[in-house]
């Protein structure tokens, strides 16, 4: 198994609600674009809009854990975390809706999308686990030039999603820096 650098979008240092919302929106927007036989539905969006922020607040999370969130046989601890969310709407969602049997096909459809990413070993190594690169710190270091060398041939099906996640993360850091400079 080759060593790869990791930039995990779920591994965020800044856990203020604004950053969590921005990061969750970025992750959701990219997951929507994964080609699958299932059309991306409002119910799928609803599930992800509630699950992703819970994992971002929790910390030490990943796409693998988001995938586990969709498995009702293995997600009891994550549901409990959702019920304790500081966001009242999320808390209510996990209390009242998430375990409803009518959502099982929706969660399976979300899991299929996630599996497409997780099954790509290189993508999984690059995006899951503890981040080994502090991209925000590197971006804020004067005079630093950051180059990503991504071999498309090694990630035929997940290459564009990996690139979009990196661009999304960079945009969040850049917007945060712009906000700091204004203050």
Identify the meaning behind each predicted range.
Residues 1-183:
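P-loop NTPase motor domains
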């Amino acid at each position: 198994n080759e060593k790869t650098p990791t930039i995990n979008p779920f591994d965020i240092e800044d856990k203020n609600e604004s950053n969590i919302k921005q990061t969750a929106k970025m992750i959701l927007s990219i997951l929507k674009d994964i080609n699958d036989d299932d059309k991306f539905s409002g119910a799928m969006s609803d599930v992800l809009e509630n699950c992703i922020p819970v994992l971002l607040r929790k910390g030490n999370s990943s796409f693998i854990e988001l995938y586990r969130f969709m498995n009702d046989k293995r997600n009891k601890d994550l549901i409990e975390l959702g019920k304790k969310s500081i966001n009242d709407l999320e808390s209510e969602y996990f209390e009242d809706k998430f375990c409803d049997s009518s959502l099982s096909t929706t969660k399976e459809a979300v899991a299929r999308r996630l599996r497409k990413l997780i099954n790509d070993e290189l993508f999984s190594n690059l995006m899951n686990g503890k981040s080994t690169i502090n991209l925000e710190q590197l971006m804020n270091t004067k005079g630093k030039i950051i180059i990503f060398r991504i071999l498309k041939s090694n990630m035929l099906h997940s290459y564009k999603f990996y690139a979009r996640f990196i661009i999304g993360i960079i945009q969040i850091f850049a917007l945060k820096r712009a906000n700091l400079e204004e203050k």
